[in-house]
Curated annotation (Swiss-Prot):
One of the GO BP terms on file: protein deubiquitination
Keyword Ligase among UniProt keywords: no
Name of the encoding gene: Usp36
Extent of Polar residues compositional bias: 126-169, 924-942, 959-975
Active site residues of this protein: C208 (nucleophile), H468 (proton acceptor)
Gene Ontology CC entries for this record: cytosol; nucleolus
Protein name: Ubiquitin carboxyl-terminal hydrolase 36
Length: 1185
């Protein structure tokens, strides 16, 4: 009887097995063996001794039984080093050891005896054998084993020819399957429940990566169906004890999915958020993380939670662990072939993957990235050790798909190790075919690999450390939705394909795969690279496919295998491929589908995008399939979603099919059904005039107005989408159409704007144009004429008079406009009168003034120059104090311009170009109050006269200033300004909001409030200004007297050319500071240089800082005048406190003065101690000079 025992650490079981086997050999031997094992320290030693005694007893030596103990003691060393060979017993006490099979291996010795130390391996064995020293010897691939004989370790290699059925070139099969691949339900229709769009998720603090990843996972049909099927586990989950109070991550995912499906408002995924440290230890709550990193840790945590359901999950091999539901859904196998360039030896290995990381640095499309990933690459020279050559050689390596996953996860490598982001646009399609990348095996070559985009994760930002994550998911209705934290909105197919995707999830398209698999006349259940379609979930798929194959007819006897977009059943393309003549009428009572809208141009069918959108990708927002309908309709619906192939599909057939599909999916009655069946063959090609929900806001209104620059406000409460980096092609087309309308409005057709496609259209009614393109309301009129009537006339109208007459004419025009704006009446022509009245009446009551710009502002979307006949509408700026309208002023208001000479005057043209962009402010108050030009808020006119010898100096705001006497001081104290300190002026302006004219710190007006150029010239000629360009402060009487200026006054002959030359120089200086002349809308002003606008003689003077300094240093009674220096920094004395006494030795006072001079030359200020010692000396020196 062969020895049969179970390997165990305890010696009792071993001794019992030995006694049972050696029962017939002699009781003394058994007793001796038991005694020896009782005194032995280890079970293995007693086993070896008992086996040796048993062998001697079988030989028949009579002294062996009597002297068994003495022989064991004498040969203790040989017994300890001896090895016993065993082999597995298949049916040994199966009823007894049934519960112990997972812990014990049943073995038996070899008949050749213990003398032969080499043993043969069994192909069905587990590859483990127990040696005499208690260690396991693991068999290799070819059956190599390590045997120990007489203390020497000897390696013997022997190949097994009996059961060697494993092929190294084929994927090994796991010994145990934890979750069958056939149980995975693909597609939303495979589930018994109704799937909603899903609620949004609240951002609880930098959790956009978590929300977007969960939304993308929840919109994968295979994963969602599996999570819903885990209800029994969720109810009886006992993993919470081992995982702590957090519980199972699979249960948390299932509960979160149920919450998003049942709630209508945004939910808070606290079940996942609280397990963040359980998912990944280094992730911190509230910190920004990478979405792909979180995805990998989340899937790994779910796999670990599933393996914990099995008691011996730690002892499972890697192949068994790769049969979990998560691995069956996301997992696949890559075949790596390394070919030696010397001996052409090919080494094949298999690699399990759950996502593909594609390099996009050299790719512009997703197909190019796939080609680069699966292309043959050359390993570095002499860097691969070939198994055939046994040396390092050059080789090539290539990947291929051995087993394609059910859900393909693709990550685009957009981030570098330094955190920088590659923001290039990668174009992709909602359907991809990976058949050309499959391994060339008989099972994989005949089956297509068609995938459909189900969800994706996008990243908005410029680097890995900042930005925002959003998700896009495909719902059961076939529409894509954008999930931006708590905001959920539908998104068009064009926007989806133009998104800078980061992570994409593609799922196997069962419908198209079943169509192609049925074309091979196989009546069995189709398989997809080892994936068997679920017959129990969709039994009508195979039946419909077989019936379609039986009734199909082809032009050729043997049609080649066709990979790519297919037409629905009953329609053939121009190549003769008939996918099925069976007529299937899909009638959805509450889920009408939408076909992609085709644009007709000259009888040709043109796609609105690079590819035609699938029929199933356009579904209704609220429609759904009733569960009472047959599965045949559902399968036929899945079959009918095919793209149009522009190389082999007839355009007219496509359009007819599109209309036919639309008629059958809309709700119809029985009479209408009969009529549709009679008119199947002759369906008129017409546009889709009834777009269904979901709808997006329309870009333009279906109105017949000409050159309308207003964008309608949509009635749908949906907010605008997150702006992506590239606009879609449809948006570019609409922008081009808008540009054409602006350039040539007289050639506009009756209906210039086409309605967008179904998911991009809106059902809102036409509204009057009341919203400008910049988002602000119009204030100058309700119609198109009012929007363009206030704009400037063509700049080609030249000045017809000489320079002197033009100056006075401009002054008269300024006075006429000022009077007309205030009183509501004007003395100009009727057109100008109507324009001025519209500007006054359309203004709201809270607006105090209107900005009038000569150059005008173009609209935000204006890319082409406007037509001279139809200038663009003026820009409108909305502020707290009202609505500001930027319009243009007319310089030729009088009728005298039309009767003037037609010759162009060069000086007048130059002058016109110089102040063409002048900006003036016109008050619209009922009464006119002449104010001080330097300080309009002053109650009394300023009495300060202009200094005759002052030079003109241009500041940042472009205003002129009067020169002042240079002062010497400590840098902290200053006299008050002529019109009061800076704080009092600021207090007077506290009621004014953003967008209004704001005075400078010194009380002077900004560029938007300064006087017009013609008034300045008129004042200079009238004698109220200096000839060198400086302008004094004029009082109210001076301004009133300037109205009665006689044009025939005595003026020097060189006055006009001098003024024009100065005006040209001044306008050139003003043009360089256009950035500083812009209106303050609440943004921070940009200062080009370090100098600040001031009223003092030093460029770095700041009156507001001076006022603050007076409160701190008012105790200084030195009586010195303040003096500020450029680049003065606050608290500079703290840094340079001991700078004056850093020089030692003789001549300390001279060194101190030299250091002070260098300090002042560098732009620093006085320190406190230097001020006390040197203030009076500098004052005296300057007074003497």
């Amino acid at each position: 009887m062969p020895v049969s025992l179970a390997v165990c650490e305890t010696a009792n079981v071993v001794n019992a097995a030995l006694r049972e086997s050696l029962g017939g050999g002699g009781g003394s031997g058994c007793v001796a063996a038991a005694a020896a094992s009782g005194r032995s320290g280890s079970g293995s030693s007693s086993t070896a001794a008992a086996a040796a005694s048993a062998d001697e007893a079988k030989i028949g030596d009579p002294s062996a039984t009597d002297n068994l103990q003495s022989q064991i003691v004498a040969n203790a060393k040989r017994v300890l080093l001896a090895k016993i060979e065993y082999e597995e017993v298949e049916n040994y006490h199966e009823s007894v050891l049934a519960k112990l099979k997972s812990k014990y291996i049943v073995i038996k010795p070899d008949n050749s005896g213990a003398a032969n130390c080499s043993y043969k391996t069994n192909g069905a064995s587990t590859g483990k054998a127990l040696s005499s020293n208690g260690h396991d010897n693991t068999n290799g691939v070819n059956g190599s084993s390590a045997a120990t004989v007489n203390g020497n370790r000897k390696q013997t290699v022997e190949q097994s020819n009996q059961n060697s059925t494993t092929n190294p070139n084929e994927l090994p099969k796991p010994k145990r399957v934890l979750y069958p691949r056939e149980n995975i339900r693909i597609g939303w229709k495979q589930s018994d429940r109704k799937w909603q769009v899903g609620a949004g998720m609240l951002n609880v603090g930098n959790t956009c990566y978590l929300n977007s990843t969960l939304q993308a996972l929840f919109h994968i049909p295979a994963l969602a169906n599996w999570l819903v099927s885990e209800t029994a586990h969720v109810e009886n989950c006992n993993i919470s004890e081992s995982c702590g109070s957090g519980g199972c991550i699979i249960c948390a995912m299932a509960k979160t999915l149920q919450t998003t499906q049942s709630n209508q408002t945004a939910v808070r995924p606290f079940l996942i958020y609280t397990k963040l440290r359980q998912i990944c230890k280094h992730m911190v709550v509230g910190r920004q993380e990478d979405a792909h990193e979180f995805l990998r840790f989340l899937v790994e945590a779910m796999e670990k939670a599933y393996l914990m359901r099995f008691r011996n999950y730690k002892e499972l091999d890697q192949l068994v662990k790769e049969t979990t539901p998560l691995s069956q859904i996301f997992g696949g196998y890559l075949r790596s072939e390394v070919r030696c360039l010397s001996c052409n030896h090919v080494s094949i290995t298999f690699q399990h993957f759950q996502d593909l990381l594609l390099d996009i640095r050299k790719a512009d499309t997703l197909e190019e990235a796939f080609d680069g990933y699966f292309s043959r690459e050359r390993l570095e020279d002499m860097g691969y050790k070939c198994e055939g050559c046994k040396k390092k050689v050059s080789a090539t390596k290539q990947f291929s798909l051995e087993r394609a996953p059910i859900t393909l996860c693709i990550q685009l490598k957009r981030f570098s190790m330094m955190g920088n982001k590659l923001t290039k646009q990668i174009s992709f399609k909602p359907r991809i075919d990976l058949s050309r990348f499959a391994a060339r095996s008989p099972a994989a070559s005949t089956q297509p690999l068609s995938y459909r985009l189900v969800s994706m994760v996008t990243h908005l930002g410029v680097s890995q450390h900042c930005g925002h994550y959003t998700a896009i998911g495909l719902t059961e209705s076939g529409s894509y939705y954008n999930f931006d934290d708590s905001y959920v909105r539908p998104i068009a197919m064009q926007s989806v394909c133009n998104t800078n995707a980061y992570i994409m999830f593609y799922e196997l398209d069962v419908a198209s795969s079943s169509i192609n698999s049925s074309s091979s006349c196989s009546t069995s259940v189709p398989k997809l690279n080892g994936l068997r379609l679920n017959g129990q979930h969709s039994p009508s798929v195979a039946t419909t496919a077989v019936a379609a194959t039986a009734t199909s007819t082809s032009a050729s006897a043997v049609s080649p295998r066709f990979i790519g977009p297919q037409l629905p059943n009953g329609y053939a393309n121009n190549n003769g491929h008939v996918l099925g003549a069976a007529k299937t009428s899909i009638q959805f009572k509450s889920s009408p589908q939408k076909q992609p809208q085709q644009q007709q141009h000259n009888g040709l069918l043109m796609g609105a995008n690079k590819f035609q959108e699938s029929a199933q990708s356009k579904h209704s927002l609220v429609g759904s399939l009733h569960k009472g309908e047959t599965a045949a309709n559902a399968s036929a619906n899945a079959i009918s979603n095919a793209n149009s192939n522009k190389s082999s599909c007839n355009n007219n057939t496509l359009t007819t099919n599109s209309q036919h599909q639309q008629q059958h999916i809309l709700p119809i009655s029985s009479d209408e059904e009969d009529e549709d069946e009679d008119s199947d063959d002759d369906v008129d090609v017409k546009a889709n005039t009834a777009p269904q929900l979901p709808s997006m806001p329309k870009m333009f209104e279906d109105a017949e107005s000409v050159a309308q620059t207003a964008k309608l406000k949509p009635k749908t409460p949906l907010k605008s989408l997150v702006p992506y980096e590239s606009a879609s092609e449809e948006e570019q087309e609409q922008q081009q159409q808008q540009q054409q309308l602006l350039v040539s409005p007289q050639l506009q057709p009756a209906n210039p704007r086409k309605r967008r496609s179904g998911a991009d259209s809106s059902e809102s009614e036409d509204e009057p144009p009341s919203i400008m393109r910049n988002g602000h309301a119009k204030s100058n009129g309700s119609g198109n004429e009012s929007s363009t009537s206030t704009s400037i006339k063509s700049n080609n109208n030249k000045q017809k008079t000489d320079a002197i007459d033009e100056i006075f004419k401009s002054l008269n025009n300024y006075k006429n406009k000022h009077r007309a704006t205030a009183a509501g009446t004007t003395t100009a022509d009727a057109d100008e009168d109507e324009q001025q009245q519209q500007q006054v009446t359309k203004k709201p009551s809270n607006s105090s003034s209107s900005l009038i710009s000569k150059n005008g502002w173009q609209s935000q979307n204006g890319k082409a120059p406007a037509s001279p006949k139809t200038p663009p509408s003026p820009a409108v700026i909305k502020s707290k104090t009202g609505i500001w309208q930027i319009t243009r002023t007319d310089d030729d208001n009088d009728d005298d311009d039309e009767d003037a000479d037609e010759e162009d005057d060069a000086d007048a043209d130059a002058e016109q170009e110089e102040y063409d962009d002048e900006v003036v402010v016109v008050e619209t108050t009922p009464s006119i109050t002449t104010k001080n030009l330097n300080n309009p808020f002053a109650s009394k006119p300023s009495s300060a006269d202009a200094m005759p010898g002052a030079k003109r100096q241009k500041l940042l705001n472009g205003s002129a200033k009067s020169a002042q006497t240079p002062r010497v001081g400590n840098g902290y104290q200053s006299e008050a300004t002529a019109n009061g300190n800076a704080v009092s002026e600021l207090l007077k302006q506290t009621h004014r909001g953003y967008g209004t004219s704001v005075l400078s710190w010194t009380g002077k007006t900004s560029d938007l409030d300064k006087q017009s150029f013609d008034l300045v010239c008129a004042k200079r000629i009238a004698g109220y200004g200096d000839m060198d360009g400086s302008v004094g402060v004029s009082s109210d009487s001076n301004i009133n007297n300037s109205k009665n200026i006689d044009s025939n006054s005595n003026i020097k002959s060189l006055t006009a050319p001098t003024l024009l030359a100065e005006a040209r120089e001044q306008r050139k200086r003003d043009a360089e500071d256009d950035e500083e002349n812009e209106m303050d809308r609440g943004r921070q002003r940009k200062v080009k240089s370090a100098s600040v606008k001031s009223n003092n003689g030093i460029p770095g003077y700041n009156p507001f800082q001076e006022f603050e300094s007076q409160k701190r240093w008012n105790g200084n009674k030195s009586g010195s005048f303040p003096r500020f220096y450029q680049n003065y920094r606050q608290n500079f004395q703290q840094r340079n406190k001991f700078k004056y006494n850093r020089f030692g030795g003789g001549g300390a006072k001279f060194q101190q003065q030299r250091a002070l001079q260098r300090h002042l030359a560098a732009g620093g200020g006085f320190t406190r101690r230097q001020h006390q010692s040197t203030g009076h000396q500098q004052q005296q020196q300057q007074q003497q000079s």
